[in-house]
């Protein structure tokens, strides 16, 4: 990471010595500022305060001995770099070059500003050690407005849109389309080419429903019903008895059955493997751990045979920013600023995500989940709605932990929680597997043997009798390596609690 920062710094420094003037030079300068902001943002998320540098240092101890800048200083500097990047980067109407452009920088700016605005708001509210003590309500609102404004700039251009198709396949298709160059939703992405040894192994591990992983019941239950209502109570309990019923697009938001495997779906080309049940009794990479097998990213329709079982031969693209991110950032920033006043704008922003899969328009009252077991049941209804929409639309895309951290929500979502999967005892899974699964050996369940309903636990929970643990006075940031403390002459102070 630090080497990458040095590369960006050198490019910015040396641009002053370049005699060439023109669009290519402008693009290079914009990219240098973008990537400096991007690398600092990654450090910022992980470690909080860091030293902001605007020149390349000589490898001399004295030059390394600098204190960390405050959170607000670092956040403001990242946003300033992105403003410069936006000024210099070119405008693009598709992602065919796979280079950053103005709207990619705006997308990152909206993410950074939303991250810091919500981080400061919620960490200050819970009085954790991690917010900037100089932050004010006005400063928090400023970040949220910047997040909304950057996203709105992209929206107002009218260049990008949500890709559409069959409501029961369009969402899934986005993540397994190998060439997204002219997809109207994708701002920036990475293309894989397995024939030239540029690939990954997602399809290999997931194309029989295993992968030594699985989705949680918490995620599955958060998808609304087809009518746009919370999936709770007797309706939920009844749908869990026959495996797969709760996943059906006739009952639930169709994004669920395009993210989690449902009986009858192809996982390999030409009908070679049709999903029936999660492989709970398999071993190693072929096992599913929760009863909910992952479908998203599985290239069931590949024509490149090595993708099916080859290590490093999967080619599903890596999307960095898509228009859905813009809409979600805009909606959340508006909800945080004033959900009631911005209700119509929030609904309008998120409507395309619902329309893609044939879901009804957002209705904050209809969707408000008051179930006592729902973790955000006391949240403002506007914020609850946009948080749910973010979780559903971006499921399994790697952003959930960062959301939990910026919302200071570990006390609600992590501490003391035991993650669970599908209903086992009291469902058709129990009948299907019979004696092939033995509790305490290759099956772990909630409750006790006398309970009529027991859910899958994805690990041996005897090692976690009190559920997941997370120290809210320490774990929102990573520890700084002792080597870094030494290099800075102890000008850097270790993060709280470490």
Give a label for each model feature:
Residues 21-28, 35, 74, 94-101, ...:
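Structural signature of alpha-solenoid helical repeat junctions
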Residues 77, 167-229, 313, 317-318, ...:
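Long, intrinsically disordered, low-complexity segments
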Residues 245-356, 496-498:
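C-terminal substrate/ligand-recognition segments
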